[in-house]
Amino acid sequence: MITIDGKYTEARVFTDELEDLARTQIRDVCNHPAFEASRVRIMPDVHAGAGCVIGFTAELKTDKVIPNLIGVDIGCGVLTARLSGLPDFSSFDARLRERVPSGMHARPSVHQALLDDPELDEEISRICMDVLRTDKDRHRRSVGSLGGGNHFIEIAQGKEHAFLCIHSGSRNFGLKIAERYQKIAVDTCPDAYLKERKKGLCYLQGENTLNYMRDMKVAQRFAALNRRVILHELLDDAADLESFDTVHNYIAEDQIIRKGAVRAGRGEKLIVPLNMRDGSVICIGKGNEEFNSSSPHGAGRSMSRKKAKANLSLEEFEASMQGIFSTCVSRATLDEAPMAYKDGESVLDNIHETAEIVERIRPVYNFKAPE
């Protein structure tokens, strides 16, 4: 474990390896008034992110909120459903491509599931018109779409059952909310040093915080519905399947900020994906307050996307995916190759105090779209 001290608090990092930029980003948080006396805990999958490290958790103890810390994919997570059996992968892949838009694409029309939730639909429309001042139609049509980058749809085999894992978030809707409120933070932040030198750490206060928290929760609901719609588009028996949702990039009811980290409350089921080749672990949380009742959300990147595309070869990517059905192994997704991520075992070695690993599931089918 590494301890990093700052003006307002200290951070504990649950790994012995930390890159310099990540260390700097953590120290910036510890020197930030928003985290005075806050318990800051960094998960073992930590790596530098846009303005803040991935794997960040902290108590929310003031009304000073930094939208950039929650990030742009608000409410992103993995919906995991236990399957009644394995589908034919070719047919499944064709159905996915027909029914679930990916990458930058949205649906041709608003999905019925959103129309069946008029309160959420109204809130999305309100945010688009009053906060984002943008066309609501595109965002509404994004419910039921996957996205690109590290988002995926995967079928994995466990000891007795197979599982469908759907990793997606709030799409461009969450991005626009994050960008809008971070701009408000920059415009209204009273800290001249932050405004001049570290705009990504400018914070909201008062009514602006309340407005952000309200709209962030709408984005979380958007993301949860998005994953659920994808599940129902892919499986005819979706309503009958046992499932659980594991969310990162949000502030939950326990008032813990989690960016690239998931809640691991006592008895709570969660999943930690590692990479396209090695699959995931299903865990039960221990509710360990020393970890802010949190767990890593994945293995964490060892290479930036740019570095991965420059240094990895398609041939080694293809070799690493032998035995896994995928029509997505290409130069366009090379930045998601297993070798671009940290060794999953090193991350799993550091989570036993916060979560019990109950099952390892291995991928037999994987779908990803380019960034």
State what each model feature region is:
Residues 71-87:
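Catalytic-core region of right-hand nucleic acid polymerases
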Residues 2-28, 35-42, 48-56, 62-67, ...:
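Domain-length cofactor-binding catalytic modules of enzymes
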Residues 111:
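Loop-rich catalytic cores of soluble enzymes, especially ATP-dependent carboxylate-amine ligases
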Residues 114-117:
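Active-site acidic/histidine clusters and adjacent loop/turn architecture
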